[in-house]
UniProtKB/Swiss-Prot annotation:
Description of how the protein assembles with itself and partners: Homodimer.
Matches recorded under PANTHER family: DIAMINOPIMELATE EPIMERASE, DIAMINOPIMELATE EPIMERASE, CHLOROPLASTIC
Top EC class of this enzyme: isomerase
GO biological process: lysine biosynthetic process via diaminopimelate
Keywords on record: Amino-acid biosynthesis, Cytoplasm, Isomerase, Lysine biosynthesis
Protein name stated in the entry: Diaminopimelate epimerase
Entry annotated with the keyword ATP-binding: no
InterPro entries: DAP_epimerase_AS, DAP_epimerase_DapF
Pfam families: DAP_epimerase
Length: 276
């Protein structure tokens, strides 16, 4: 059978989006791996699947597969593309949408200027919720990698993140240290590794090594986690502008227990069909 799909991106973080509300198919990890290959498939960082909700309190269910076939809890840039997609495809007329993910419920607000604001919910710092192995909760933790100790923050934005402060993201060892942090035994479900350079109280540069995808042009939940870690440790004040290789995101967070708001673009690239 042939399935219609849309290729989209949020700041260069690219996605294949499938409507499984009006189409019906059983998508497996092997399909994500096959289609995600940039040489022999469609090529993407993540596969986003739009499904009918399983409870009446939300509008849609949102599933995410990495290009390596692993299913993950959350994707912030993908959430913005999800919102744009369901409106463009007339799956809803609402501009404020409630969506269930493996990481919890998020709210998406499509603004008149085309930007999408995502209410990511409150960040979680309890180690067991991330999950991260630690004796007690702290703002930062020493993490030993190859005999060297790095001071990291650990945050869940519905998916696990580590945040390491660096002097300059351009020279940060993202490709050397990123995969080692991703697979560190203290992160039982692996982790997204962020490298943040604080420019001033409201601006920062960020690169992210994503779990199951490697370094991407942008990571929405990574930007949220980095902003939260920087605000919590007193390095920055909300609102925060995060510059990633693919572009800029605006992050707001009023403090513990409060939701993180992320605003940025969502762009449609092309439409296509793929054989299942």
């Amino acid at each position: 059978m042939l399935l219609r799909f849309t290729k989209m991106h949020g700041l260069g973080n690219d996605f294949m989006v499938l409507d499984l509300v009006s189409q019906h198919a059983h998508i497996q990890p092997k399909h994500a791996k096959q289609w995600g290959d940039r040489n022999t498939g469609i090529g993407f960082d993540q596969l986003l699947i739009v499904e009918a909700p399983s409870n009446p309190d939300v509008d849609f269910r949102y599933r995410i597969f990495n290009a390596d076939g692993s299913e993950v809890e959350q994707c912030g840039n993908g959430a913005r593309c999800f919102a744009r997609f369901v409106l463009d495809k007339r799956l809803t007329a609402k501009k404020r949408i409630r969506v269930e993910t493996k990481g919890g419920i998020i709210e998406l607000d499509v603004r008149n200027d085309g930007q999408v604001c995502v209410d990511m919910g409150p960040p979680r710092f309890v180690p067991a919720d991330i999950p991260f192995i630690a004796d007690e909760q702290a703002l930062s933790y020493p993490l030993e990698v190859d005999g060297q100790v790095h001071q990291i923050a650990a945050v869940s934005m519905g998916n696990p993140h580590s945040v390491l402060r660096v002097d300059d993201v351009r020279t940060a060892p993202v490709h050397e240290l990123g995969p080692k942090i991703e697979h560190h035994p203290r992160f039982p479900q692996r982790v997204n590794a962020g490298f943040i350079q604080v420019v001033d109280r409201h601006r920062a540069n960020l690169r992210v090594w994503e779990r199951g995808a490697g370094e991407t042009q942008a990571c929405g939940t990574g930007a949220c986690a980095a902003a939260v870690a920087a605000i919590a440790q007193g390095w920055m004040d909300s609102p925060v502008t995060i510059d990633l290789p693919g572009g800029r995101l605006s992050i707001e967070w009023a403090g513990p227990g409060k939701p993180v708001l992320m605003t940025g673009p969502a762009v449609r690239v092309f439409e296509g069909q793929v054989r299942l």
